[in-house]
Amino acid sequence: MKLKPSCLKGMENMYGISKIEKFIDEKDSLSLEDSSGRVKIDTKSDINVNEFVTGIPVAFKGQLNNKEIFVVNDYLFYSVEDNSTNTPMDIEMNTPKENQNLILFISNLNIGKPEESKNGLAESARTMLIDFIQNNNINKNLSDISSRIKRVIFVGSSVYVNQKIEELDKGSYIKAEDYKIELNNIINNFTSLDKYLNIVSSYVHVDLMNSIEGNDGVYFPQNPNGQFLFLDNIRNINAKTLNLVENPYIFDIYSNKLKTKKYFLGTSGENINCIMQYSSINEPLIAMQKTLEWGHLAPLAPDTFRIYPFTDKDPLLLDRIPDMYFISGKNDFNSKVIEMNADGGNKKNVTLMELPDFSSTFKGILFNIDDDSINEINFSQDLSFNKS
């Protein structure tokens, strides 16, 4: 690809050169590659070059022309099996209450974000979130909703990390004294998060996902946060009321009403951002749908997306079709339901969710595991519940 970044282009960070948002060009081409070699694909066929990215597992049907270019007649992506008939399994250790059928998603808590000191709205929203979970000082309608929450899942950046720290491995520089200040800020932010989660996980089961953003040198898939960061929560961690989970996060939750499980898949969103950078896709939900169609969460890895060098098995290759697929979003809430092919020619509905940024919108998302309905809840000055 003409615009693919290199180590030399990385010097743009040092000299303040404007950042390129899209690494695509009208002259980009497609090639089919396997262990035997590489051949160029005729893009005059019904193929949009810039809707593909490097690394997609795909089979092409066609033939070589006299110019040694492969003319495509048909193509097929990796087939993801649907194991939705597996024995139901719930991620909770204890027996859930019969009426608990809601999962609350909170994306980008961003504790310590500088904007908080200006108006205090984010801190107020976090306090209101605790009141909601504790069933404290809320009306009966919200109280009934709160009592039905089965689990709270924190996605994305739960603590704020200064951009100066994030870009140290990209050629940027920072003064030693500034680095010490920012490092202390991060430690203080994690201490605040520890205390906050100690309150929340005392009332409801909590899953805390990790995030690549703000973690330089971190590779995908990402291990859970270390327990040493949450000393106030050791008892809750041992009791499984606070779960430090990996990224991507894959789990099943049992529906008492349906007498079966729902399969969930979520990431912090960096894999989706990478796909949009290297393709003409501009909407996260479309990029998410593409990863399901391609059967791979991050086909660009390791070319332009850092992952561990696995040799025996690709952990980012999908082996099941999720009922719900979510990512940490940067803006407001977006969702849609798509239809995927399942084994035996059956169809399966999949709910896609780009979660709202809590630190700027003060919104969380409630997902009903019984009927797949979605509702927004606003933790601003006036706690409100809106059907999506």
Outline where the language-model segments fall.
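Extended recognition/assembly regions associated with phosphoester-bond processing machinery
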Residues: 1-388
